[in-house]
Amino acid sequence: VALSIISCTAATGVACAQGSAKAMPDTREKFEPKRDASKDIQNAIKKATKENKRILLDVGGEWCIWCKRLDEFFETNSDARQYLKEKYVVVKVNFSQENENKEVLSKYPKIPGYPHLFVLDKGGKLLHSQDTGLLETGDHHDHDKVMTFLKKWAG
């Protein structure tokens, strides 16, 4: 319950709230507390090496409306979704009361709010830590800001 109230983006003061972003079919990949994030990252490294892609760690949880809004952004913007698919191997890393993934996340810089994105090279080396609050405009993720971020770090 406490995590439902923590700030999504501490830097911008935007609060997380429970609930869905919009009434649309929920086909997105969810943040799963029971997943083995370390194993998922190792599998992503193998895939990224084989496909010559970067890795995008998407850290968040089902409790965070901005995490759902970021997923919705990719669902509704086919150009961004396609670019992400072509250039990145995406790994959702759960952060919730059920599983904070402390061991995995301790290897990366402190997260100021959720969702948070880490860009890794194909070997798993951290290239960039992205506060997603900087990719927002008002109550949504800004298409141009997200695309600029994706293109800058695609390699």
Positions of the model-derived regions?
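N-proximal helix/coil linker or "cap" segments that precede and/or mark the start of modular domains
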Residues: C16-R35
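Thiol-based oxidoreductase modules, predominantly thioredoxin-like and allied folds used
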Residues: R35, A80-E100
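A short beta-strand-turn-helix
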Residues: R35-K53
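Short active-site neighborhood of thiol/selenol oxidoreductases, capturing the structured segment around
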Residues: E51-E62
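Typically the conserved alpha-helix immediately C-terminal to a functionally engaged Cys/Sec
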Residues: K68-Y83
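Structural alpha/beta surface segment adjacent to cysteine/selenocysteine redox centers
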Residues: N99-P112
